[in-house]
C-alpha cells in the first residue's frame, strides 16, 4: 500500500485493469461460442504521465528491466519480454489511429498467478493509457477488440474475446454473458434469492506461457473438426481463418462424428456441450440457482479434461479435491487449463475449511510446490477503469 500511495502521488493517471475468471464457456470463444465471466477485485495497476514527445518508458514492479520505444514508429519484432504487451497495444492502436504522444509509467500486478488472464489485463491497461495520451475516445467494446487483436496478431495467441470482454465490461453485481459470434453482450444481475458466494483461486504453483503451450494447437484442432464436417457433407470449404464450429449445426456433427478422427470429434463435442451448458447456466444464474450453476461449471471442467484434453496433473488434482469439499458450489480450471490455477464458487462460511483441507491434500500429492502453492479469495468487481 505504501508503494501504491507513493505512485499515486508521483503520477497523474492511474488505471486499474482487473483479472478475470470464467465459470462457464471455456475454450469456445475462438470458435465464436457463448461465454460467461467476471472481472475480479485483483488485477493490474498502471500509473503514468503523458509525455510531450513520442517516447514510451515503462518500469515494472513485477518484472526486471525497463521498456523504451517510440509510439509513432512501427512495432519491432516481438522480443519475448514483458514489454511486448505495450508494443502490442501500440501495434493494434496504430492500425486505427495516429499516435504522437507516449507515456512514462509503472505497472504492477497484484497476484502472482497464471490462469487469470494477466496478459489481457495488461494489454487493456496499455490500450487505455495510450488512447488517453493521444486524446482518443474508445468505447468499452472497442477496447476489447483492440486488445484482443494485439494479443492475437502481435503476441501470437489465437484467442477469442472472452478474456478482454470480462476485463473491460465486467460489473461487480452481475455475470457477463457474451455471444462471441454476434458480439452481443449483457450483464445479468444477481438474483436477490441467490446465496452469497466468494471466488476461490487455487494456484498450483506452476507458471505458464500460453504461446508455448498447446493452446494454439487446440484452436487448430477445433477448426480441423469444422473442416471435417464441411468436407463430409460436401459443403464449400472456407479458408482456415474463417472456419468456426459455431457456423456448423450440431446435427451435422451428430451425422459426421463417427467418420472423423477421434481427437477432432472430442474437440467438437466440447464445443457443442459447452454451448448447451452456458445456455443452462445463464438460466440458472437468472433464477438464482447457484447450486445448478456450480454443477454446470464442474461439468465444464470434466469436458475440458476428457474432450478438450487440457489440464496438468496438478490442476486435475486440485479440481478433484475441491469437487469433494463441502461449501464448493462449483468450479473449473481457470484460463486455458495448461498449468495455472483452478477457480471455485464457494459458500463464504466454508472458506477456512476449504483452504485448509485443499492445501493439505494437494501438498500431500505435490510436496514440491509447498513454497509456491497459494490460495486467494476474491469477489466480482467492475471492469477496467481510471481510478
Where are these regions (language model features)?
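Glycine-rich phosphate-binding loop
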Residues: 338
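Gly/Ser-rich oxyanion-binding loop with an adjacent helix/lid
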Residues: 1-34, 68-73, 79-194, 324, ...
Amino acid at each position: 500500500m505504501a508503494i501504491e500511495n507513493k505512485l499515486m502521488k508521483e503520477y497523474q493517471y492511474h488505471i486499474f485493469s482487473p483479472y478475470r475468471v470464467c465459470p462457464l464457456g471455456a475454450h469456445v470463444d475462438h470458435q465464436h461460442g457463448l461465454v460467461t465471466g467476471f472481472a475480479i477485485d485483483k488485477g493490474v495497476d498502471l500509473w503514468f504521465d503523458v509525455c510531450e514527445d513520442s517516447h514510451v518508458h515503462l518500469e515494472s514492479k513485477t518484472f526486471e528491466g525497463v521498456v523504451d520505444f517510440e509510439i509513432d514508429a512501427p512495432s519491432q519484432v516481438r522480443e519475448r519480454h514483458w514489454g511486448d504487451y505495450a508494443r502490442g497495444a501500440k501495434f493494434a492502436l496504430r492500425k486505427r489511429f495516429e499516435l504522437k504522444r507516449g507515456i512514462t509509467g509503472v505497472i504492477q500486478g497484484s497476484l502472482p498467478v497464471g490462469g487469470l488472464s494477466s496478459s489481457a489485463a495488461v494489454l487493456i491497461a496499455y490500450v487505455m493509457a495510450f488512447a488517453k495520451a493521444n486524446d482518443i475516445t474508445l468505447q468499452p467494446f472497442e477496447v476489447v477488440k483492440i486488445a484482443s487483436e494485439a494479443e492475437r496478431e502481435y503476441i501470437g495467441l489465437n484467442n477469442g474475446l472472452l478474456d478482454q470482454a470480462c476485463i473491460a465490461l465486467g460489473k461487480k453485481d452481475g455475470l457477463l454473458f457474451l455471444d462471441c459470434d454476434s458480439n452481443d453482450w449483457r450483464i445479468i444481475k444477481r438474483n436477490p434469492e441467490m446465496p452469497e458466494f466468494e471466488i476461490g483461486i487455487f494456484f498450483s504453483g506452476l507458471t505458464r506461457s500460453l504461446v508455448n503451450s498447446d493452446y494454439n494447437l487446440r484452436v487448430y484442432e477445433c477448426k480441423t473438426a469444422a473442416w471435417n464436417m464441411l468436407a463430409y457433407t460436401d459443403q464449400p470449404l472456407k479458408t482456415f481463418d474463417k472456419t468456426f464450429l459455431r457456423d456448423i449445426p450440431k446435427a451435422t456433427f451428430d451425422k459426421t462424428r463417427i467418420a472423423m478422427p477421434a481427437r477432432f470429434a472430442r474437440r467438437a463435442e466440447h464445443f457443442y456441450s459447452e454451448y448447451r451448458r452456458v445456455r443452462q447456466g445463464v438460466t440458472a444464474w437468472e433464477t438464482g440457482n447457484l447450486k445448478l450453476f456450480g454443477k454446470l461449471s464442474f461439468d465444464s471442467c470434466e469436458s475440458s479434461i476428457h474432450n478438450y484434453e487440457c489440464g496438468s496433473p496438478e490442476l486435475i488434482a486440485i479440481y478433484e479435491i475441491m469437487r469433494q469439499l463441502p461449501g464448493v458450489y462449483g468450479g473449473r480450471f481457470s484460463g486455458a487449463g495448461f498449468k495455472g490455477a483452478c477457480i471455485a464458487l464457494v459458500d463464504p462460511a466454508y472458506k477456512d475449511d476449504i483452504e485448509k483441507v485443499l492445501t493439505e491434500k494437494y501438498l500431500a500429492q505435490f510436496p514440491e510446490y509447498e513454497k509456491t502453492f497459494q490460495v486467494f479469495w476474491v469477489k466480482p468487481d467492475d471492469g477496467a477503469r481510471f481510478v
